[in-house]
Amino acid sequence: LLTSCGSNAEKNPKLQDPTAQTGTNAGPGVVNEKEEDEASEKAGGNAGAASTQETVITNLSDAFTGETTASAKYAAYSKKAQEEGFPQIAMLFKAASASENIHANNHKAVLEDLGATIPVVKPTYTVKTTQENLQDAITGESYEISTMYPEFIANAKSINSQLALISLNYAYKTEQKHKVLYDKALAALQSNQVKTLSMQYYLCPTCGNTYDVMPPKRCGISMTNSEKFIQIEKA
C-alpha cells in the first residue's frame, strides 16, 4: 500500500517519500513487516458507513494529539528508567519518544495539506515505576494497533485519502514494532535480564520504524535507505 502511494507523498515535502526499491527486514525481536500489509488491508476492508474528509481530519487530529503526548511521556519514562538504574530501558524509551515525534510530524503535515487547524497539545501523563511505565506503554501500543489505527486507516481508505493512508500506515506498522520491544523489555526487567537489552537504536526518519539491531539496507516499512537513519546511542 505505501509504495503505491509514493507519488502522492512527493506533493508534500513535509511528508518524506519512501524510496521505491524493494527492501527486506531483519533482526530478532521484530515483527514480519511484509505480513503487516495483510493486516493493513484487513483494517481497510472493515470500513462501515462512508467516511467524510471531516472524519479523516478528526482522526488525524486525534492521532497527532496521541503521538505528541506519547513522545513527551516516553521521554519522561526514559528519564525515570535512567534514575532507577535501567539505562537499556531508558534508551528504548528515548528511541520510542523520537519515533512518536516523527509520527506526530507526519500527521501534522497531512493535516496542513488538508487545510485543517493543528491542535494545540498540552501532554498530560503520570510517571510511575519503570515496570509500571512499560506496562502503560504496552497498553497504549496495544490499543493503537488493535483499535485506533485500524479504524483510522479504514476511514482514510474509504475516501481514498492517500497522504492520510501513508502517514497512518507508517504509525500503525511502527507501533507494532514498539509493542514487541516493550514486551521484550518488560520480560527482561521481570527476569533480572535488563543488561541483555540493546543500548543503541536506529530510527527511520521517514516513518519512525525502530530497530534495536543493525538495520537492513532499507527500512522494512518505508524503504528509506538506512544510511539516512537516526542512531540513538545515549539516554
Regions found by a protein language model. Give the residues of each.
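C-terminal motif of bacterial Sec signal peptides marking the signal peptidase cleavage site
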Residues: 2-4
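Non-heme di-metal
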Residues: 6-235
